């Protein structure tokens, strides 16, 4: 117990571990050991996980070819990702799905363009009608009677018997 609390002893153990690790890593054959170990671990995991999964999938699936193809493509894509590649292997089914998706998107865009052009044509026709109604038409004489609200005003010649109805009359009242 005293040795565990001794600082010098602890430092000596750490130094011993570090020197051991450095001698292992300095060996040229051991320099790639972590990479080799990680690749072997991944391959072992894929082997242990994929074989039972493929057996079950082949027994339960009606189309075993597609299942095998999908599993192999998935394994290769995983290995490519581990190797650092951004490209992936795609099957014909995936390409067809992507093409169908692109075609649907293009159809949607074409329908939208068709709707927009129809609306624009309608707007142009509406603007033409508005312009035609707003066009200034030349007239010989402009009737201003509607504008100044004097349509029912009569001149002196038009009054009955030439009398002005608005002139005051002499009114006599009995008292």
From Swiss-Prot:
Annotated glycosylation sites: 8, 18
Statement: the UniProt record of this protein carries the keyword Transport: yes
Cytoplasmic side: 52-175
Residue stretches spanning the membrane: 29-51
Compartment(s): Host rough endoplasmic reticulum membrane; Host membrane, Host caveola; Secreted
GO cellular component, one term: host cell rough endoplasmic reticulum membrane
GO molecular function: channel activity; metal ion binding; toxin activity
One GO term of the biological process aspect: symbiont-mediated activation of host autophagy
PTM annotation: The N-glycosyl content is primarily Man(9)GlcNAc, with a small amount of Man(8)GlcNAc.
Keywords, comma-separated and alphabetical: Activation of host autophagy by virus, Calcium, Enterotoxin, Glycoprotein, Host endoplasmic reticulum, Host membrane, Host-virus interaction, Ion channel, Ion transport, Membrane, Metal-binding, Secreted, Signal-anchor, Toxin, Transmembrane, Transmembrane helix, Transport, Viral ion channel, Virulence
Residue ranges annotated as Lumenal topological domain: 1-28
Binding, Ca(2+): 120, 123
Topology in the lipid bilayer: Single-pass type III membrane protein
InterPro entries: Rotavirus_NSP4
Domain notes: Binds 1 calcium ion per tetramer.
Subunit annotation: Homotetramer. Interacts with the immature particle in the viroplasm. Interacts with host CAV1, early and late in infection. Interacts with host integrin ITGA1/ITGB1 heterodimer. Interacts with host integrin ITGA2/ITGB1 heterodimer. Interaction with microtubules blocks trafficking to the Golgi apparatus.
Family note: Belongs to the rotavirus NSP4 family.
Function noted in UniProt: Plays an essential role in the virus replication cycle by acting as a viroporin. Creates a pore in the host endoplasmic reticulum and as a consequence releases Ca(2+) in the cytoplasm of infected cell. In turn, high levels of cytoplasmic calcium trigger membrane trafficking and transport of viral ER-associated proteins to viroplasms, sites of viral genome replication and immature particle assembly.
Protein name (Swiss-Prot/TrEMBL): Non-structural glycoprotein 4
């Amino acid at each position: 117990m005293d040795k565990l609390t001794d600082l010098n002893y602890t430092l000596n153990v750490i130094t011993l571990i570090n020197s051991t690790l450095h001698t292992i890593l300095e060996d040229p054959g051991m320099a790639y050991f972590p990479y080799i170990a990680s690749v072997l671990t991944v391959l072992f995991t894929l082997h242990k996980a994929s074989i039972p999964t493929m057996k079950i999938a082949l027994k339960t699936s009606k189309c075993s070819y597609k299942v095998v193809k999908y599993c192999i493509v998935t394994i290769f894509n995983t290995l490519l990702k581990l190797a650092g590649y951004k490209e992936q292997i795609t099957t014909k089914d995936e390409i067809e799905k992507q093409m169908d998706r692109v075609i649907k998107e293009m159809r949607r865009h074409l329908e939208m363009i068709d709707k927009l052009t129809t609306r624009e044509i309608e707007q142009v026709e509406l603007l033409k009608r508005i312009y035609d109604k707003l066009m200034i038409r030349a007239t010989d004489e402009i009737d201003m009677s509607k504008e100044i609200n004097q349509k029912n005003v009569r001149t002196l010649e038009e009054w009955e018997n030439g009398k002005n109805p608005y002139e005051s009359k002499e009114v006599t009242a009995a008292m």
